[in-house]
């Protein structure tokens, strides 16, 4: 704990001389200037509307329509005006004009590549090299050895003989 404490002990480090900041600070008003006009008080401290305040004939709560009560949502202002947005708007205007419809049929060259693809989908937990077709044809085929067949499930600590893991070739 410090032996010396001052209420403004850290103020000196933020002094313009210490920060080597030679700009003259902007002068701000100490208090804001008063506004013209007044606010009309329409209710008392308990929230009851005062006498003499005109009330709505349709609703005792007034006819104020909030944002969520509006029938139509407020307009969205587009703050980002890009070239793509203006081109898109021009295309929409052009497409609004009547024109002949052209029947389009997909060409055989642009058919979906997923159907014709020879690569098989691999499971999620498999490594990328396990499911590749080139790797599968290059792998040598292992035949189970008689030693692997004679291993009991108890030695493998496997619950059933079907789940026993074969030894690598």
Curated annotation (Swiss-Prot):
Biased composition annotated in UniProt, kind: Polar residues: 119-130
One Pfam family hit: CFAP126
Disordered: region residues: 53-169
Major site of localization recorded for this protein: cytoplasm
Source domain of life: Eukaryota
Transmembrane region(s): none
Any one annotated GO CC term: ciliary basal body
Protein's GO biological process: cilium organization
Subcellular localization: Cytoplasm, Cytoskeleton, Cilium basal body; Cell projection, Cilium; Apical cell membrane
Classification via InterPro entries: Fltp
Keywords on record: Cell membrane, Cell projection, Cilium biogenesis/degradation, Cytoplasm, Cytoskeleton, Membrane
Protein role: Acts as a regulator of cilium basal body docking and positioning in mono- and multiciliated cells.
Family: Belongs to the Flattop family.
Protein name from the UniProt record: Protein Flattop homolog
């Amino acid at each position: 704990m410090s032996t010396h404490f001052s209420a403004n002990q850290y103020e000196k480090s933020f002094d313009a001389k210490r920060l080597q900041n030679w700009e003259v600070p902007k002068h701000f008003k100490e208090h804001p200037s008063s506004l013209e006009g007044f606010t009309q008080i329409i209710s008392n401290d308990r929230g009851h509307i005062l006498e003499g305040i005109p009330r709505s004939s349709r609703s005792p709560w007034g006819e104020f329509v909030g944002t969520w009560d509006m029938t139509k949502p407020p307009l969205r202002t587009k703050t980002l005006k890009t070239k793509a947005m203006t081109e898109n708007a021009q295309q929409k205007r052009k497409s609004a004009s009547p024109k002949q419809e052209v029947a389009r049929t997909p060409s055989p060259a642009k058919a979906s590549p997923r159907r014709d693809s020879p690569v098989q989908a691999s499971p999620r937990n498999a490594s990328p090299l396990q499911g590749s077709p080139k790797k599968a044809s290059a792998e040598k085929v292992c035949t189970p050895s008689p030693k692997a067949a004679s291993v009991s499930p108890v030695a493998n600590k496997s619950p059933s003989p079907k789940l026993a893991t074969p030894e690598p070739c």
